[in-house]
């Protein structure tokens, strides 16, 4: 019995280590790209118009229609897109079929939206849990990453404002 408990405990620790990486005390369900060059933005299809990303901060939200926390984030992402429209482009990327995303009526997405059923960028980032957000500066460097509602590490308007002020060209 003790062997089984030890094996289960070791398996849980291994799984936890595999699924999350520490980032200044923040748990990530992805590989950390903080202060590193962001991978190339890859999408299969734009549901919205394609944004002009030149000289902009880019907030990318990996999400799905079935994900409760992802849907909870949409109104706040809408607000970020409005509040920081001069400096920030918000993009939601789902790996679901375009029809599935278009069927979702509430909440309404008011920012740029794209589909990548192959999850190319999501795989490059090693994302294993959603929602997962990265904020990229105009030079292509990741300046914020993670689960936007993680206690003590929330992505807020103040956080975005501070990053824009710090890393704006």
Predicted regions and their residues:
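Sec-dependent N-terminal signal peptides
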Residues: 4-13
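Structural microenvironment flanking redox-active thiols in thiol-disulfide oxidoreductases
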Residues: 71-109, 117-124
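Short pre-active-site segment immediately N-terminal to redox-active cysteine/selenocysteine motifs
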Residues: 56-58, 62-66, 97, 129
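Thiol/disulfide oxidoreductase modules built on the thioredoxin-like
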Residues: 103-109, 116-163
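A short beta-strand-turn-helix
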Residues: 33-58
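N-proximal helix/coil linker or "cap" segments that precede and/or mark the start of modular domains
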Residues: 17-40, 169
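C-type cytochrome heme c attachment motif
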Residues: 65-72, 132
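Structural recognition of the beta-strand scaffold that forms the well-ordered cores
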Residues: 58-61, 89-93, 112-114, 135
